[in-house]
Amino acid sequence: MSNEFITFEKISRKSWKQLHQKSKPLLTQEELTSITSLNDNIDINDVIEVYLPLIHLIQIYKIAQENLSFSKSLFLKKDIQQRPFIIGISGSVAVGKSTTSRLLQLLLARTHKTSTVELVTTDGFLYPNSTLIKNNMLNRKGFPESYNMELLLNFLDTVKGGQTASAPVYSHEIYDIVPDQQQTFTNPDFLIIEGINVFQNQQNNRLYMSDYFDFSIYIDADSHHIEQWYLERFLSLLELAKHDPANYYTRYTSLPQNEAIAFAKKVWKTINLENLEKFIEPTRNRAELILHKAADHKIDEIYLKK
């Protein structure tokens, strides 16, 4: 074990699944398929063995957070302020963050039937393409400087304070912020924040997004596996774009497959891999839990902070 993981407890999947014995998955295979991202690989068995124990762990953290909030209110002689339990989820492009986020949202809603569970991605806080082009940063999209961190931190601060907050909406189909569209959140019970940058803050080293989290997860995998998943996803996106002229990826559909793959490999190496190695992976030890995936997308190891 490297020094990076010295503060984590390493748990095998076999041991992890025994920590929670419920076998009812809380959703159907059809529902699971509907929330699974392109080229991801997950089944009901994964839900039972990995995600149900995780839901149970999150409940433990939520109870602890509520107890602390109550005790602090007594100490300060103030009324308890109802605020969301915020979960941050990070990891590389194409590692499966979106599938995990949507699955947790569904499972939390099924477990806490009277609670509201919302999901927001940090993609919405990217600067619009027009701004990136103006500042010659379009080729840095996804890197720390391409995010409006002030807007993102203000959003988190508002949500954490129990107030109504709005977030911009990003579309992967148009590869840009959707004009005049907002996602509004009114003091949900749970808020999941998903993005490659949720443990970063390049503008203010004294304040991290993770300061607002009650629980945090990093989705991990070997970079050469993630590259393969990225290439597979890129080809799937090209197939979808063939019949949609408005889709950003339509411009690449006329390329021969070998040229399309070469282009995707270049993007991976010069943008996504560099971003992963310099800015994303170095933040993973800020997570409370690390889910490690094997080559087949299956979670094989879990690291829980001691």
UniProtKB/Swiss-Prot annotation:
It catalyses: (R)-pantothenate + ATP = (R)-4'-phosphopantothenate + ADP + H(+). It is an enzyme of class 2 (transferase). ATP binds at G91, S92, V93, A94, V95, G96, K97, S98. GO terms for biological process: coenzyme A biosynthetic process. It comes from the Bacteria. Keywords: ATP-binding, Coenzyme A biosynthesis, Cytoplasm, Kinase, Nucleotide-binding, Transferase. It is found in: Cytoplasm. GO terms for cellular component: cytoplasm. Coiled coil: none annotated. Pathway: Cofactor biosynthesis; coenzyme A biosynthesis; CoA from (R)-pantothenate: step 1/5. One of its GO terms (molecular function) is ATP binding. Its EC number is 2.7.1.33. Pfam families: PRK (PF00485). Belongs to the prokaryotic pantothenate kinase family. PANTHER family: URIDINE KINASE (PTHR10285). This is Pantothenate kinase. The lineage of its organism: Bacteria, Bacillati, Bacillota, Bacilli, Lactobacillales.
